[in-house]
């Protein structure tokens, strides 16, 4: 009987189930979008029950359409939108509030208070993160402080917290496994990335009871099995978990120190593997856990850019400049340059290395001769400039010079953007054959745990390149363009 690995990719806007075979190829996939809730400006929430429903739906669709029986699944890997926080009742299994999404700014005031109390240095040292509404810790505190009776229930040990991976493992296992992996734990603001434990000092700071927290385990091991009534009568090992960006790093086979990938999704996330050492950042990067496997923990430096693919969506839906995102490449290629136009897409502030949530988007250098084509090109170029900002910070922090950048995500189909990215970074950009690297990474982690794949060397052999973009731009030109971007950033920051 032919066996497969099932990868569950629970993202910000949709849930997907993807079946992989022994060669790391996609056999079939199914996708289902779910509702985004915006109760107040800057707030973003999801219904965790709806997410769970979407996962059950895509599993059923994927298996039936592929004509694969549940007993043919050797293991399940889970990858997830990170930082998004769910708090649920241990007994009823029902969330006590919507999941607060990573993008949501509703805990910004809590963060300001913590900074004023002087916690920043301690948080940075222990977690590798900044005090920011982006991470899970303040979201949990907000739920406990704002949902009636929640704090009392939490103190009594009646509530459980989890990032989305934890929620899904708990549901799939019928409430038997309350676990997370190192990569997801490292994004909560409550986990010490050096001694690999939930940290009492951080929990006191956030007033979160320890009894709510999941057990932290490696990213590749069997956490439990599916309870039969959630998996067509089968007990399948749930065997791999990693946050989406770390899973993509693993799926891109960036196993060596200094290897890096950039994912172009809603936002952009660039991670560089720093091996078994946690490199502290002096340049606004995050130090995070890449994965834990074979008794070892790998660390990474991460740069987070809040607006990437969503800038292209904005051109399409908000500005109505084209009907399909793929047209952006056509328009951008019609002009030789932006004619000095810069777009800074700070719609929800700026991430790495600026970390300024107050700034908003801006546009510079506009003349009467500026056209739609210039505007679209400038928006695409802004994605590449933001990655350059991140790379400069990474090289400064790690002392490692990047040799090539592996890329994935929706926008990598845009050849104009990939070529410009290579030019502005002055390094080759490699696009893989399988772009679903996030789901692939989770599949690999699960497959290794159940012996479906032997080791990381076998996985490395499966990475194949679709196209390599080489830099051809004169250094002087790219430096000039980047200097203009830096000026645009300064001007944007001045306007608040």
Curated annotation (Swiss-Prot):
<dbReference type="GO" id="GO:0006072">
    <property type="term" value="P:glycerol-3-phosphate metabolic process"/>
</dbReference>
<keyword id="KW-0418">Kinase</keyword>
<dbReference type="GO" id="GO:0005524">
    <property type="term" value="F:ATP binding"/>
</dbReference>
<dbReference type="GO" id="GO:0005829">
    <property type="term" value="C:cytosol"/>
</dbReference>
<feature type="binding site">
    <location>
        <position position="13"/>
    </location>
    <ligand>
        <name>ATP</name>
    </ligand>
</feature>
<feature type="binding site">
    <location>
        <position position="134"/>
    </location>
    <ligand>
        <name>glycerol</name>
    </ligand>
</feature>
<dbReference type="GO" id="GO:0004370">
    <property type="term" value="F:glycerol kinase activity"/>
</dbReference>
<feature type="binding site">
    <location>
        <position position="414"/>
    </location>
    <ligand>
        <name>ADP</name>
    </ligand>
</feature>
<comment type="pathway">
    <text>Polyol metabolism; glycerol degradation via glycerol kinase pathway; sn-glycerol 3-phosphate from glycerol: step 1/1.</text>
</comment>
<feature type="binding site">
    <location>
        <position position="313"/>
    </location>
    <ligand>
        <name>ATP</name>
    </ligand>
</feature>
<feature type="binding site">
    <location>
        <position position="410"/>
    </location>
    <ligand>
        <name>ATP</name>
    </ligand>
</feature>
<dbReference type="Pfam" id="PF00370">
    <property type="entry name" value="FGGY_N"/>
</dbReference>
<feature type="binding site">
    <location>
        <position position="83"/>
    </location>
    <ligand>
        <name>glycerol</name>
    </ligand>
</feature>
<feature type="binding site">
    <location>
        <position position="16"/>
    </location>
    <ligand>
        <name>ADP</name>
    </ligand>
</feature>
<feature type="modified residue" description="Phosphohistidine; by HPr">
    <location>
        <position position="230"/>
    </location>
</feature>
<dbReference type="InterPro" id="IPR043129">
    <property type="entry name" value="ATPase_NBD"/>
</dbReference>
<feature type="binding site">
    <location>
        <position position="82"/>
    </location>
    <ligand>
        <name>sn-glycerol 3-phosphate</name>
    </ligand>
</feature>
<feature type="binding site">
    <location>
        <position position="309"/>
    </location>
    <ligand>
        <name>ATP</name>
    </ligand>
</feature>
<feature type="binding site">
    <location>
        <position position="134"/>
    </location>
    <ligand>
        <name>sn-glycerol 3-phosphate</name>
    </ligand>
</feature>
<dbReference type="InterPro" id="IPR005999">
    <property type="entry name" value="Glycerol_kin"/>
</dbReference>
<feature type="binding site">
    <location>
        <position position="309"/>
    </location>
    <ligand>
        <name>ADP</name>
    </ligand>
</feature>
<feature type="binding site">
    <location>
        <position position="12"/>
    </location>
    <ligand>
        <name>ATP</name>
    </ligand>
</feature>
<keyword id="KW-0808">Transferase</keyword>
<feature type="binding site">
    <location>
        <position position="83"/>
    </location>
    <ligand>
        <name>sn-glycerol 3-phosphate</name>
    </ligand>
</feature>
<comment type="subunit">
    <text>Homotetramer and homodimer (in equilibrium).</text>
</comment>
<dbReference type="GO" id="GO:0019563">
    <property type="term" value="P:glycerol catabolic process"/>
</dbReference>
<dbReference type="InterPro" id="IPR000577">
    <property type="entry name" value="Carb_kinase_FGGY"/>
</dbReference>
<dbReference type="InterPro" id="IPR018485">
    <property type="entry name" value="FGGY_C"/>
</dbReference>
<keyword id="KW-0319">Glycerol metabolism</keyword>
<feature type="binding site">
    <location>
        <position position="244"/>
    </location>
    <ligand>
        <name>glycerol</name>
    </ligand>
</feature>
<keyword id="KW-0067">ATP-binding</keyword>
<dbReference type="GO" id="GO:0006071">
    <property type="term" value="P:glycerol metabolic process"/>
</dbReference>
<feature type="binding site">
    <location>
        <position position="14"/>
    </location>
    <ligand>
        <name>ATP</name>
    </ligand>
</feature>
<keyword id="KW-0597">Phosphoprotein</keyword>
<feature type="binding site">
    <location>
        <position position="410"/>
    </location>
    <ligand>
        <name>ADP</name>
    </ligand>
</feature>
<protein>
    <recommendedName>
        <fullName>Glycerol kinase</fullName>
        <ecNumber>2.7.1.30</ecNumber>
    </recommendedName>
</protein>
<feature type="binding site">
    <location>
        <position position="245"/>
    </location>
    <ligand>
        <name>glycerol</name>
    </ligand>
</feature>
<keyword id="KW-0547">Nucleotide-binding</keyword>
<feature type="binding site">
    <location>
        <position position="82"/>
    </location>
    <ligand>
        <name>glycerol</name>
    </ligand>
</feature>
<feature type="binding site">
    <location>
        <position position="266"/>
    </location>
    <ligand>
        <name>ADP</name>
    </ligand>
</feature>
<dbReference type="InterPro" id="IPR018483">
    <property type="entry name" value="Carb_kinase_FGGY_CS"/>
</dbReference>
<dbReference type="InterPro" id="IPR018484">
    <property type="entry name" value="FGGY_N"/>
</dbReference>
